[in-house]
Design a protein with these regions (language model features):
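Juxtamembrane segments at transmembrane-helix boundaries
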Residues: 4-14, 43-52, 67-92, 100-252, ...
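Signal-transmission linkers at sensory-effector interfaces
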Residues: 112, 270-317
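Helix-loop-beta substructure at the N-terminus of cytosolic sensory domains
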Residues: 86-89, 167-176, 192-199, 318-349
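Hydrophobic transmembrane alpha-helical segments in integral membrane proteins
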Residues: 26-27, 52-66
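Structural signal for the N-terminal portions of transmembrane helices
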Residues: 257-277
Length: 349
């Protein structure tokens, strides 16, 4: 007996993943198993002292990374997609997350170092120069932990900024955001196949950079902030920009070697995400600064619209006899003039 097999649509899949219990049941095993297998992969490489073949790394390991961190992205997306856009909460959470990452990253890089060596700028390489195989167990631990921390920060950053970029969302803005993520992931997956100076690599990176610039100017949420809120967010953007810039310097500096040997695609995606975060914060700071003088005029416009809306409601109530009589009776009681009120109307019938 042949049965029809129905494939769920994209909307049905999103609705399924929005259910927290279902999401955890489906995605946590994928992420946990994939991450453990990646740790085992690098431990075997360290024990054998020989690098895996190109085909094994391309089809097995890169595919494993795609499934593992794809599951992590969906897990974080499910926890944050229902939150409304709040610039104050977003900038503050990014500042705290960046500082927490820097502190944990510093502690991870201290693993295996002498207790008296406090400078992380000392060029201590834990990988073979020609093969890239980890030379010590500490390098295996560092590369796996730093990769997870960087992925968590990059995914959290993008998911937090998503609410601000898609404020007053349109179909065009959603399409631009999705294409930015797709080009960032696509160029990161292909970056290991080309040399740094090749024209094709520069062309691949130009696509996400162009879309990053386009999405960085989507700051429509600024128009709906009060003067006090704009001042508060102005200070928070400075803090978040400084913390995120320090994080980008850390991921492209001391931690770059470890995450690059873990996965060049993940390292490239993280750096692109952090660069977009810094770009969006700088754009937000400049936009907030330029919108400060116009706050009063915008607030007056909002008040005028509110007064006009109230007038329209009052006019509509005048033409509604029942609502008009109800308002006349209710107002003296609400004003405290009388404890009770009534209205006698003649019956013209």
């Amino acid at each position: 007996m042949i049965r029809n097999v129905t494939i769920p649509s994209l909307q049905q899949t999103e609705m399924l993943l929005q259910q927290r219990r279902t999401r955890l049941f489906l995605l946590v095993p994928f992420f946990g198993t994939g991450y453990i297998l990646s740790v085992v992969f690098h431990l075997l490489s360290w024990k054998s002292g020989t690098p895996p073949s190109t085909w094994v790394r391309l089809f097995y390991y890169d595919g494993l990374m795609l499934i593992t961190y794809g599951a992590l992205w969906l897990l974080l997306w499910g926890e944050t997609h229902q939150r409304g856009p709040s610039p104050t909460r977003t900038f503050w959470s990014l500042t705290v997350a960046s500082l927490l990452f820097l502190g944990l990253g510093y502690l991870v890089l201290r693993i295996g170092r002498p207790s008296g060596d406090l400078a992380l700028s000392t060029p201590v390489s834990g990988f073979a120069y020609e093969t890239g195989v980890p030379l010590t167990w500490a390098a295996v631990v560092q590369m796996n932990v730093l990769a997870l921390l960087e992925a968590l920060l990059a995914f959290w950053l993008l998911l937090q900024l998503r609410g601000l970029v898609l404020f007053k969302r349109t179909r065009q803005s959603e399409r631009s955001w999705r294409w930015m993520l797709i080009t960032m992931a696509g160029s990161a997956l292909l970056v290991d196949l080309f040399q740094p100076g090749e024209f094709v690599l520069a062309l691949l990176l130009s696509l996400p950079v162009g879309l990053m610039l386009r999405n960085a100017f989507r700051v429509a949420w600024i128009l709906y902030l009060t003067f006090r809120q704009k001042l508060l967010n102005l200070g928070l953007t400075v803090l978040a920009t400084g913390a995120l810039s320090g994080t980008l310097a850390f991921t492209s500096g001391p931690a770059h070697e470890y995450v690059w040997h873990y996965s060049p695609a993940l390292s490239s995606f993280v750096n692109l995400s952090l660069a977009f975060g810094v770009l969006y914060l700088v754009t937000s700071f400049l936009s907030l600064l330029f919108h400060l003088p116009t706050t009063g005029a915008f607030q007056r416009k909002v008040d005028e619209l509110a007064a006009l809306h109230a007038l329209m409601q009052l006019v509509s109530q005048v033409f509604d006899v029942e609502r008009l009589t109800e308002t006349i009776v209710r107002l003296p009681v609400e004003a405290g003039v009388a404890q009770a009120a009534w209205l006698a109307l003649p019956d013209f019938q």
